[in-house]
């Protein structure tokens, strides 16, 4: 199997650290997916999105999640996020403790060069 970097140097991750109301984790996932997979998700229509986000659940706390995605332009992500919060107001946000759905942004500053990954894969 060919190895590929998780993300590209110079791009950005958005990292949401989400704690939902106690006992509401499964409901959160259901409502999140309803919005994320729906026709009303402007994030998926942006050319600035490189890879679609993934929602991860903490293995030790069923009400704790991380949402991570790769973007070329965090200003565009921020603009869309603010529009979604103001105009669309997805139902899943109501389940987040404190009601805040704001990520940290991280610049990707290093990645393994493809030739190194290819060499490792060839050695298998």
Model-derived features: where do they sit?
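Short, surface-exposed ligand-recognition loops at beta-strand->loop->(often short) alpha-helix junctions
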Residues: 19-32
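An amphipathic, aromatic/His-enriched active-site/gating alpha helix that lines ligand/cofactor pockets
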Residues: 34-51, 60, 70-106, 123-124
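Short beta-strand/turn micro-motifs at beta-sheet edges
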Residues: 1-6, 53-57
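Acidic/histidine-enriched, glycine/proline-rich intrinsically disordered or flexible terminal extensions
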Residues: 6-7, 104-124
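A generic structural signal for beta-strand entry/edge sites
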Residues: 62-64
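Short coil/turn motifs at secondary-structure junctions
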Residues: 21-23, 72-74, 110
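Active-site-flanking beta-strand signature of metal-NTP-handling nucleotidyl enzymes
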Residues: 11-19, 66-68
């Amino acid at each position: 199997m060919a190895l590929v970097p998780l993300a590209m140097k110079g791009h950005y991750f958005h990292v949401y650290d989400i704690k939902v109301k106690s006992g509401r984790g499964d409901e959160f996932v259901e409502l999140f997916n309803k919005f994320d997979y729906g026709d009303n998700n402007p994030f998926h229509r942006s050319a600035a999105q490189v890879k679609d986000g993934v929602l991860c659940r903490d293995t030790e706390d069923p009400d704790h999640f991380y949402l991570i995605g790769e973007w070329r332009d965090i200003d565009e992500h921020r603009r869309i996020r603010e529009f979604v919060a103001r105009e669309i107001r997805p139902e899943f946000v109501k389940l987040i403790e404190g009601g805040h759905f704001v990520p940290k942004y991280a610049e990707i500053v290093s990645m393994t060069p493809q030739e190194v990954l290819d060499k490792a894969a060839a050695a298998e």
